[in-house]
Amino acid sequence: MVGMLFVWQTFLFVWACAAAVEVGEKPRPVIDIVRDVDNLGSIWQFKGTNTLIRHQGREILVRHGGDQWSTVKKFDQGVNTVEVDPYYPERRAFAWLENNELYKTDDCGKTWARVMHVEAEPGENLQRYSVYSNPDNYKYLMVTSHFERKDSSPVLAESYEKQWVSQDGGKTIAPLGHPDPGVYRLCHFLRQARNHDVAKDSTILCIEHDAQKHTAVLYRTDDFGKSKQALDSFDDEIVSSVGLLGKYILVTTTEDAYNKHAVQHVWVSRDGDKFQKIIFPTHIRDNFFRAVTTSTGNQIIFSIPAGKHSHSRKNALYANYISDSSGIQFHAVADSLDERYKELGPVMALDANGTLSMVARKSSTEDQVTLLSYDYGYSWQPMHLAEGEDHKALGCSKGGKECELPVQLSQLVSSSGLVGHGESATSGILMGIVLKKRGSRGPRKHKYLSVISRDYGLTWSVAFEYPVLSFAGNYGNILLACPYNPGDDGDPEEEIYYSLDQGHTWEEHHIEGKYEFVRVHSAISDGSSTAFSFLAVGDDQNTIVVDCIFTDIHNGKECTDGDMEEYKLRNGNCLNGARYTINKRKSEAACLLKNDPSVINPLVKPCDCTNADYECSLGFLGLPDKGCTADLGMLRSAGACKDNPRELMPMHKIKGNECTKDLNIEPVKVDCSAVQNRPDIEVTAHVFKTQFETYQYFNSAEDDSLMVLTKDKRALISHDSGKTFKMLDTLGSGAELITFNRYFGDLAYIFASDDVLYITDDRGYHFYAVDLPEVRHLFLPLAFHAKDNQTFIYFGGKDCEKLGPKCHSTAYITTDGGRNFREMLTGAVSCEFVGSIYSHPANKDMIMCEIENKKERRNILLRSTDEFRTSDKVFDSIIGFHTTGDFTAIAVSEGRQQVSSYLTIDGVHFNESRFPPDFVAPEKQQSYSVLSAHEGAIFLHMSKSLVKHKEYGTLVKSDSNGIDFVVLKDGVNSNAEGLVDFETPEGLDGVILINVVENLDQVQKGKAKAKHLKTAISFNDGVDWKYLSPPGKDSSGKKYPCHGKNRAKCSLNLHGYTERKDLRDTYSSGSAIGYMLGVGNVGEHLLPYEQCSTFLTTDGGVTWTEVKSTPHQWEFGDRGSIIVLVPDGVKTNSITYSVDAGRSWQDFKFADEEVIIDDIITVPYDTSMRFLLISKEHLRGKSKTYAISFAHIFKRQCEFHPGGGRHNGDFEYTSIKHPDYKCLFGKEVEFLKRIKYDCFIGNASYTKDYRTSRICPCTRQDFECDYNYIRTSDGTCKLPSGVKPEAPSAVCERNRDLVEYFQPTGYRKIPLSKCEGGLKLQRTDSPHPCPGKEKEFYEKYPSSTNASSVVFWWLLLTMVLLVPLWVIYDRGIRRNGGFSRFGEIRLDDDDLIEENGLDRAINKVVKVGAYGVAGLFGFLLLLKSKAGARIRRFRESVSSRRGPSYSSLISDQFLDDANDLLVGHDNDANNLNAFLDEDGQHFDVDDEIEGADQASYHDDVDLGRTSE
């Protein structure tokens, strides 16, 4: 008995000691540090086993549990990668060798078999490779290799992929066909998830991109490439990409193959056969969007980065959209949010039966919060701090639910599976990082804290006082963390923390030496792993690998029922139609869960169905609990409006919902008649409770963004041409003004009433706020730098507490985008960064500013090159200055009410504009307008009358230096604001339209009640003018009462620039070459606007047609392939449009209710197929908008082949030329024009693809009158009577760069003209050196002799000639009677004095001279007689014509070189009308005298001729 007791005592002691040892020892993982990391691979774990695998060098290593690593395979080549098959992680892995051989194992690494060897062809590099298995068939494998060509080719693609497939698990493998050269192909098994709806597990989907043709083909094969089946859904679509997302196949198509920023459309399919386009509330552009699915796999979540390069921004904002359970109909997450939340991050699916997370910010200046949704995004709530946690450490005023947290879920967490996607699960354990709020307690050493949640993110506790990277294993029962910075925990060495009790306590393992972790790898990616591999880099750049292996932790004990506890999701409330209970391991349990996710699968108890379990059906909008309303447009797009009327179910149960006892849903009748047969035009209407004040598109091709300022001081932004709008949060302050940067199309500035400036550099997607200087806002325009978007000048009022004499403007400059301002210049009211604008500035940093001098009541112009730290005065008294093109024009005050014009092209040299003698200026020039500048010429309108409703002026044009002006036309219409009826159609060089005052004489004398206006057009930059040619019939086919042959009495007249409601509206479009629209009438002069019709030209103004009998507003779309008209000033509910260049027109009803459309707008370049109608209800103070899209009205995109022949796909080369001559400005230019009307153009750069078919010889049409010369009735240029020509060398004084000058001819070449050869009216052939430039002149003309040499040789020649001449005179003329007998000498006279042989020789010379002189005079008399006879005969030949005759010289009689006539003694142009061109052909200048009396006798009336 005593022995037995001793035995028991001994046993109990040993057991107690063992227990004490077991309790005292904490379980620790195996942590190995590998310092020889050359070609050391990451750890992988075979699922459901404790077997680990990796590679090093040429070996593959395996480890079982706590055993050591052992070699299972050694190759002749080094191993590049080893990866476990994600679909069959229990047994299969693949290994790639350095020689591109592929091996596989099917038994957890015990044995290995060769699959294939990938070889690159000559001239190719193998970049990467991958192997894919099929989740539903173990034997199916696909190997993909990515190649790049060493030498790029214009025909072959730079990179491409090849695919091989195996049907027997890799025993044999064959290529999946080969794409054509130049084609890039991507292929996937369509089965990407088990239980997929794809009919066959062998189905492969491929997309082939042809980069040269900008096309892609999508097809499927069910027999491994033996046959291909094209997808019919995309026959007329431009496919851009294909992707697989859970149960869905996603295909994106683009509206424009030539525009990388074009609108994208997404199509979804579950079976790879039937695809349906998603219904999306806005536009998707680019391909930078995130797509995830919810836990059921039915809902798709799109998170689209907002704005330019947002996908790479650190704190990018996102627009989030969630689909219904069909994956087709999307709604914006923002629609389900509290209005407090303005800015959103991407949505993440937390895989907890519908749990989603999203970061939000209440405003751009407030702290972020993270929101949770448990119902697929229909409602959201913030994350908050757990009870009992120190809220003050986070900056919260209260704890618990009052402390909302901005939790950024750890990147390691989301990528590893702590939260994860697919099969990943962690029993509700999440880790993240929190940014401390403003005013948090304690040291600010660390701005971030690491937090942990154990209830799927509802409540959070602090885990670390600094940010850590975190990782999870065994479904959250193993947690690892390492500090972002090794020294954050007070220890400079790196360490790894791990927790085995779900983050309640942490153990630390030090890593000797100073290392920083750069990569962490989990052996299994679904959250079940028990092995991890850390890569760390030391200070000396040496690397180590730290393996943390938990496979034998807790002695390998697996959890039993006693180690588990129940957790009810959402506190036991219904979620997705059921109540979910999850088995979680107790945090203190010393065990690991089985390596099987089924151990944590929830228990599901269905709930009775409610509205929350239903969603609106396809084509219905709203929420089930508030009612689902039919949207006819969406129903039509979804194909649900084929029959009429029809009954449809407004809502249905969410797919995958677990609820029972379905609701009784009554069908609704839908009348589809309104949309069944209408064209495929989309309309989106909005009603605003305020009126639009200003609106403008951003000048960018990346999207259709615009901003609106409303009357109640709100700023609205739309990125889809008005389809959706959002409001900018100005924190309660009103938006006072919106300004756009004229040089950078993505930038805009919003002035708020609290002196805050909101700036966007990405078209309104993001804004940042800056404080303006503490001065009064004067609403003066910002001045922008043309090259630096961060530099601009703001003008504020100092001493302006009260508006009085002390109040003055001050300029403040910023060079960092407004974040800091520096006071630059007091008194400045206007500045320009001229150094950034000029082509050749004297200093690129030059700024010019206008300074207001209140005391002397004048303004001063200053300039500076150091931001006005120093400056110098340019002019003492100016009216203003303006930079256009490459010129700055300054209006200088010259005494009381007198203005002069000065121009500069470099900011240093200023030249006064010189006007010709025929320019009759008013006694005091009070104003002028700078109209245009191009190709080195500037147009001015010099005002001659500022009398109200009687304003007009003279149109003048400068030479290439902007100095010497010539008159183009007098009596050009203007208004009191300085606007002028002057327009140059975009894209048409030299074409100008103006309105002239027909009754100018009566207006000048004060006898006219109103101005009578006529529209004139010039095709050669203002040299010649014609009245517009009227159409023969009106829009109803009736002839006009007047005939266009007499254009003085019958021409087309258009309302011009002075009457525009919006000055941005123009006749033309820069993208629709040759197209113009205008409102006017056919008759003697212009009628009032309401009595006019709408006219169209497609040939640059040569011919016109009436398209509507009433005034309409218009816009061009898609480079002119769409023309949209809307009635102006009357109620309407329809638009009229044409898609065939105006040949036919269709009406489209955009609304049921009639409204007055105030404006129709589109993007600045008229390249979009979307338009916005704006209506203002002035009495009710509302605005309505109608976003109209023609994006789907065409069947296809036009084919365009750059560099093709005359017929280029759907385009044809056509020329826009002078109506009377083939050449325009010395060349024949042909543009590509669409000739097939069933396609749209898009962003194909065909407008740039023009060609010059011929350079023409110079003709009279390529010249205009030079300075001081005037145009006469016969078209020649002459000096006015009494005007002396300036010295020819004066041109050298005006242009100091000139080396030579020529004798003036009265003509100068039009700067736009590119002609070569032919006439040279602008100069003689003999240049002369400019004073002081003789050296440069003779270097330029080496054949010329220098001045001293010329003098010497002339003196020598003179001496040689004078001696014999004196002898001849003395002995042959003087003593024979002198010159008095010269005309009497008879050739047979014998009374000449001859004393010797010398006398006889001299007399013979005298006789020969007499013959020569007599012959010369006789020839001249004969020539004069014959020329006079020819002129008389020419006048007789034209006398039968009606009207005055021409005065013309027939040049081929006596001109060997036409230029010889240009050097006349009277310095005029010698009455020239015709000269020889290169081909020796004659041409007539069709110049006719202006005026009603003369014009009544002519078919064509040329304007601009003034009879002498």
UniProtKB/Swiss-Prot annotation:
Main location: Golgi
Any coiled-coil regions, as ranges: none
Residues carrying covalently attached carbohydrate according to the record: 353, 789, 911, 1243, 1346
One Pfam family from the record: Sortilin-Vps10
Cytoplasmic compartment residues: 1370-1404
Gene Ontology CC entries for this record: cytosol; Golgi apparatus; membrane
Topology of this chain in the membrane: Multi-pass membrane protein
Signal sequence, renumbered to the chain: 1-20
Superkingdom of the source species: Eukaryota
Residue intervals passing through the bilayer: 1349-1369, 1405-1425
UniProt xrefs under InterPro entries: Sortilin_C (IPR031777), Sortilin_N (IPR031778), VPS10 (IPR006581), VPS10-sortilin (IPR050310), WD40/YVTN_repeat-like_dom_sf (IPR015943)
UniProt BNR repeat ranges: 164-172, 372-381, 452-461, 497-507, 717-726, 812-822, 1095-1105, 1137-1146
Protein task: Functions as a sorting receptor in the Golgi compartment required for the intracellular sorting and delivery of soluble vacuolar proteins, like carboxypeptidase Y (CPY) and proteinase A. Executes multiple rounds of sorting by cycling between the late Golgi and a prevacuolar endosome-like compartment.
Protein name: Vacuolar protein sorting/targeting protein 10
Taxonomic source organism: Eremothecium gossypii (strain ATCC 10895 / CBS 109.51 / FGSC 9923 / NRRL Y-1056) (Yeast)
Gene name for this UniProt entry: VPS10
